[in-house]
C-alpha cells in the first residue's frame, strides 16, 4: 500500500512529535520474505518491510537505511505486518531514502523459532535483509547510490552495532 505524506505530517502534528524533518513524499510499503540462517546455520525464512519514496525514480539513486526495531515479543508487532512499526524506515523514505525494516528471526513470518534476544548472530539476518532489499529494488528498476545507513534503538541498537561489526569484519567488500 501507500502511506501519504499528508498522513505522516498529520501523525506527527497530532502526536506533537518533532523528528527534525518534514515528510515530502508519499511512501509505498512492501512486505517481503527472504532467506537467512539461524544460530545453527540452518536456513530460515524471515520477513520485513521495504519503504520506497513514491516519486519518479527512473533517473535517481537512493541511499538505503536499515532500521532495527526495539525490543518486541509479539510476533505481529513488526513492520511487515503493521507498516507503522517500521516508523524510522517509513519516515526516512518520506524524505528520499529506501527504508528497510527487518522483522528479525522469531517475529513476523518466522514463527517456527523463538526470537533470539540480543544475540550478535542476528546481524546475519539484517545483512540478508539488506541484500534482499537491494535485490528487490534492482528488480523493480530502482537504483541505490551505494550509501548504507544502519541504526536501531533498544534491542535494535545492539543489533545495529552487531551488524556494523559483521559488515566490517566479513562483508566490507560487498557494502
Set out the residue ranges of the language-model regions.
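Catalytic-loop region of hydrolases
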Residues: 1-57
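Active-site machinery of serine-nucleophile hydrolases
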Residues: 29, 84-108, 123-132
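Structural recognition of the beta-strand scaffold that forms the well-ordered cores
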Residues: 32-33, 64-67, 98-103, 147-151
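Short, surface-exposed "cap/lid" segments of acyl-processing enzymes
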Residues: 39-47, 51-96, 103
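Gly/Ser-rich "nucleophile elbow"/oxyanion-hole loop immediately N-terminal to the catalytic nucleophile
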Residues: 52-61, 131-151, 170-174
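Conserved catalytic-core motifs of eukaryotic protein kinase domains, centered on the activation segment
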Residues: 77-79, 110-113
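Alpha/beta-hydrolase active-site loop
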Residues: 116-139, 161-164
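Gly/Ala-rich beta-loop-alpha elbow adjacent to hydrolase catalytic centers
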Residues: 152-156, 160
Amino acid at each position: 500500500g501507500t502511506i501519504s505524506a499528508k498522513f505522516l505530517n498529520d501523525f506527527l502534528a497530532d502526536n506533537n512529535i518533532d523528528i527534525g524533518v518534514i515528510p515530502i513524499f508519499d511512501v509505498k510499503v512492501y512486505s517481503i520474505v527472504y532467506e537467512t540462517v539461524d544460530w545453527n546455520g540452518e536456513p530460515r525464512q524471515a520477513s520485513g518491510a521495504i519503504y520506497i519514496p513514491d516519486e519518479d525514480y527512473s533517473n535517481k539513486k537512493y541511499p538505503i537505511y536499515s532500521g532495527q526495531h526495539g525490543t518486541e515479543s509479539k510476533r505481529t508487532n513488526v513492520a511487515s505486518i503493521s507498516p507503522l512499526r517500521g516508523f524510522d524506515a517509513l519516515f526516512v523514505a518520506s524524505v528520499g531514502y529506501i527504508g528497510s525494516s527487518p522483522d528479525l528471526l522469531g517475529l513476523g513470518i518466522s514463527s517456527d523459532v523463538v526470537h533470539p534476544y540480543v544475540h550478535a548472530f542476528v546481524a546475519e539476518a539484517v545483512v540478508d535483509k539488506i541484500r534482499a532489499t537491494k535485490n528487490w529494488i534492482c528488480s523493480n528498476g530502482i537504483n541505490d547510490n551505494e550509501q548504507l545507513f544502519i541504526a536501531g534503538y533498544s534491542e535494535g541498537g545492539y543489533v545495529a552495532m552487531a551488524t556494523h561489526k559483521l559488515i566490517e569484519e566479513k562483508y566490507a567488500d560487498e557494502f
